[in-house]
Regions:
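N-terminal beta-strand motif that seeds the catalytic metal site of vicinal oxygen chelate
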Residues: 1-19, 44-46, 62-64, 115-121
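Conserved short beta-strand elements that form part of the metal-binding/catalytic scaffold
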Residues: 28-62, 108-114
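Vicinal oxygen chelate
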Residues: 75, 81-121
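Short, conserved charged micro-motifs
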Residues: 17-18, 71-75
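Short secondary-structure junctions
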Residues: 27-32, 85-89
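Short beta-strand micro-motifs in enzyme catalytic cores
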Residues: 38, 62-64, 95-99
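Conserved active-site tyrosine of GNAT-family acetyltransferases
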Residues: 18-23, 78, 106
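Loop/turn position at the start of each blade in beta-propeller repeats
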Residues: 3, 35, 94-96
Length: 121
């Protein structure tokens, strides 16, 4: 029935700026680019940008954690692109490390380095 998470949507009232920021920060171009939604394919998942923020408290939602191989490098990379640190890299046990940053649009972006978990295609 459930196949796993497929899409994370961040709300960004300035879609053009958000598209440029995520293109540079994640190093991929959008595969879907419309005035009402921009979608990126990132490691088998979709990152969506939605400019409609009506009824949304930006940054006060569930936090999606993007899997990374080198969390120190990924964390520094996002900070260098203008993200603001929310939670520094920390070990949460079992060699699992997490961190969060806030993108320029107020969305919390989680990072996780977990040697025990491999996403299925």
């Amino acid at each position: 029935m459930f196949l796993g998470l497929r899409t994370v949507i961040y709300h960004a009232p300035d879609l053009a700026k958000a598209k440029a920021w995520y293109t540079a920060a994640f190093g991929v171009a959008p595969y879907f680019d419309e005035p009402f939604y921009v979608g990126f394919q990132v490691g088998g998942f979709e990152l969506g940008l939605d400019p409609d923020v009506s009824g949304v408290t930006v940054g006060n939602n569930a936090v999606a954690y993007w899997g990374v191989a080198d969390i120190e490098r990924a964390h520094a990379h996002l900070l260098a692109h203008g993200a603001r640190e929310s939670q520094p890299v920390k070990d949460v046990g079992g060699d699992i490390r997490v961190a969060t940053v806030v993108d320029p649009f107020g969305n919390v972006v989680g990072l996780i380095q977990n040697p025990h978990f491999t996403a299925e295609a």
